[in-house]
Amino acid sequence: MAAAGRLPSSWALFSPLLAGLALLGVGPVPARALHNVTAELFGAEAWGTLAAFGDLNSDKQTDLFVLRERNDLIVFLADQNAPYFKPKVKVSFKNHSALITSVVPGDYDGDSQMDVLLTYLPKNYAKSELGAVIFWGQNQTLDPNNMTILNRTFQDEPLIMDFNGDLIPDIFGITNESNQPQILLGGNLSWHPALTTTSKMRIPHSHAFIDLTEDFTADLFLTTLNATTSTFQFEIWENLDGNFSVSTILEKPQNMMVVGQSAFADFDGDGHMDHLLPGCEDKNCQKSTIYLVRSGMKQWVPVLQDFSNKGTLWGFVPFVDEQQPTEIPIPITLHIGDYNMDGYPDALVILKNTSGSNQQAFLLENVPCNNASCEEARRMFKVYWELTDLNQIKDAMVATFFDIYEDGILDIVVLSKGYTKNDFAIHTLKNNFEADAYFVKVIVLSGLCSNDCPRKITPFGVNQPGPYIMYTTVDANGYLKNGSAGQLSQSAHLALQLPYNVLGLGRSANFLDHLYVGIPRPSGEKSIRKQEWTAIIPNSQLIVIPYPHNVPRSWSAKLYLTPSNIVLLTAIALIGVCVFILAIIGILHWQEKKADDREKRQEAHRFHFDAM
């Protein structure tokens, strides 16, 4: 009975172990929740137009480039203490009485320091042509007095690409001196003809510099107007041995009247880039739609047509091209990111109530196709109408993804009207999605230096356009899974692309079997610049330094681990097991000691009894 009476107290020793194992086995319940963290990130400074991301001071923390009062650029540097983004660097363009229209950080002179390209509309503009100026980086900051105003103007915001494969960003666009595309080569800042084409460039364009031919070398994608019919079309200029030549021309979907900005994503998780196109079938966007054309195909497949919710019809906000804009014009844009880390990229869009004036940001989740119209694409978008903190932001103008806490989980940034006449309010929403899915975060640097960088600072923040990343792994069910992404493929019209790629892996904790990285190559070079790494740990950040450019086997990669919830749960379970084992050892030791004492007393008693 005494032994039976001790049984409950012995079982109590199992509780840490059982609790830990229960948590580990069940895991967190997936949840789609957003939490507004604007105050802790910005304090009272949450206003302006977020125009770009980049690591200005090379501290491996992404900084924010914000436009204010039409002609000021403020750089919010990431900080370890709240508020976590502080306005530290300011460049003013007030003396030029200009409206700044875009900001593109990059290393335009090859010194491994981040510079910043601004495009602007002069106050006295008559032809609506954009001026451009480069502020040069120095000592991990910007010198407002050290700048170069480009000697040509642009018809539209330029595309930042690596035209000659030297990993110094170049500036591509139609200038005031020719109706043919020109390229301003980074480094020596010399102008050259880029391409010979009869097509006109569409305004606003959504050109891209990304691999579309599955050879790990970035191609040039152009949004153009047919020279004879003036219809919208899309041209792929393939990079063949470092030279661009037109390989594919694709017409827009026949019934699309309002054409938005092209976006690129590995929509179906096959390792190849797909082309997404939002738009409307009527001028007022009463009937909105998103089409997709798969890699290597020419057939447009609708992946979202249902924009109605509880009797309310929503639609895209058409682009308004004003001759004298007072604010930055914003075209129909999909901002791509894997919100739930399932390996299938999702999107953020701005939609307007077609029967009212309400305008909000919505999350589009990438889900398996459930109807005949999207069968060819295998997947489709589903609108998440009910995301509380996102729904509370009225008059939203821009919504994009951003890894606020550098933990591999993509959070959301929304710009909305209403702060002042000329400035937006900035809202930041933490992503509390807790399915404990895995990811790999990859950033490819310029590789212009390795261990011999100026002031021994590795240039983490040079915003390199053109690298292409692809992985292969095995999912939780044992099937082969691929994923791919291009780094900084688009730069115009508030593309707001991140200087890194977060690739979701789903709930499989398997190592990545292969991770490939390719970079652009110069004219005449036939060998592809591509390197492979194997057995990459999930939930890690990989920083690739392609140095020297033409010897991929010598490229280096730095790996940084980001522990996930499962690591914490495993630690709890392990501690529980250790406590349990120590308790058992302690009890057994105590019982053995008691038995020894009892035996000694019996021996002593027997000795005295025998003596008598």
UniProtKB/Swiss-Prot annotation:
Domain of life: Eukaryota
Tissue expression from the record: Ubiquitously expressed.
Membrane topology, record value: Single-pass type I membrane protein
Glycosylated sites: 36, 95, 139, 146, 151, 176, 188, 226, 243, 353, 371, 482
Pfam families found in the cross-reference section: C2_ITFG1, FG-GAP_3
Start-end of each FG-GAP repeat: 258-293
Localization per Swiss-Prot or TrEMBL: Secreted; Membrane
InterPro entries: FG-GAP (IPR013517), Integrin_alpha_N (IPR028994), Tip (IPR024881)
Keywords associated with the record: Glycoprotein, Membrane, Secreted, Signal, Transmembrane, Transmembrane helix
Transmembrane segments: 567-587
Signal peptide: 1-33
Main subcellular localisation: secreted
Stored Gene3D superfamilies: Integrin alpha, N-terminal
Entry annotated with the keyword Membrane: yes
GO cellular component term of the entry, any: plasma membrane
Function: Modulator of T-cell function. Has a protective effect in graft versus host disease model.
Subunit structure: Interacts with RUVBL1, RUVBL2 and alpha-tubulin.
PANTHER family for the chain: T-CELL IMMUNOMODULATORY PROTEIN, T-CELL IMMUNOMODULATORY PROTEIN HOMOLOG
Homology family: Belongs to the TIP family.
Protein name: T-cell immunomodulatory protein
